[in-house]
């Protein structure tokens, strides 16, 4: 595959400075906002039910993340999502911890039933639980399962009529027909809380400027993975604190040329 067509999306994000409306969790709010700013997007965190519909209507993308789940936030997510749908604003959903508790799983299945999603992004366990496939989960982490990640992703894309993104050691992007695997990234990402949540919001910035959502997601994942590799090369021996700071630097400094040089993607049959 031609990495150049994906790398161009990074430049487009930085030229366009898209507004990304995040209804995310309290653990990752600051990291998400700083990561989007470093990339070149414009983050807004608006949660009040009195304003979410209006804010979502003017955004380039809406990101719904249920990490620290409360009923009032679910209400706000539904209001924002329906407004985004009505105004042709792409909606991304991160079903954090789906399968961990019955309430969390119920919400993770209810939101896609009520809102048309451009992207759903999670680990294998989360996505499997959204579509009621058996996969063990540990807290909000992936746990273990016997399923085929590519098959789970394709099934989710088909059942939810969306682009499914499953992230892990390898990342899978599919709309049910096109399936692409991305092999960039670094294990130290798992030692910094919020890197998955930020990733969903970064995909949101890419989706805001590229309407081919498979292409946007692959571009975002490749960019994010390469940035993490470049950051780790400078800091991994120091530890996750140093990595987190350098990762923000690399979100600002990683170029389209870096993606073309270091990107590792494969389209599956």
Swiss-Prot record:
Keyword Nucleotide-binding: yes
Known pathway: Cofactor biosynthesis; thiamine diphosphate biosynthesis; 4-methyl-5-(2-phosphoethyl)-thiazole from 5-(2-hydroxyethyl)-4-methylthiazole: step 1/1
InterPro entries: Hyethyz_kinase, Ribokinase-like
Binding-site list for substrate: 45, 194
GO biological process: thiamine biosynthetic process; thiamine diphosphate biosynthetic process
EC nos: 2.7.1.50
Signal peptide per UniProt: none
Catalytic activity: 5-(2-hydroxyethyl)-4-methylthiazole + ATP = 4-methyl-5-(2-phosphooxyethyl)-thiazole + ADP + H(+)
Cofactor annotation: Mg(2+)
A Pfam cross-reference name: HK
GO molecular function, one term: ATP binding
UniProt keyword terms in alphabetical order: ATP-binding, Kinase, Magnesium, Metal-binding, Nucleotide-binding, Thiamine biosynthesis, Transferase
Sites where the protein binds ATP: 121, 167
NCBIfam families: PRK09355.1, thiM
Family of the protein in this entry: Belongs to the Thz kinase family.
HAMAP family, alphabetized: Thz_kinase (MF_00228)
Function: Catalyzes the phosphorylation of the hydroxyl group of 4-methyl-5-beta-hydroxyethylthiazole (THZ).
Record-given protein name: Hydroxyethylthiazole kinase
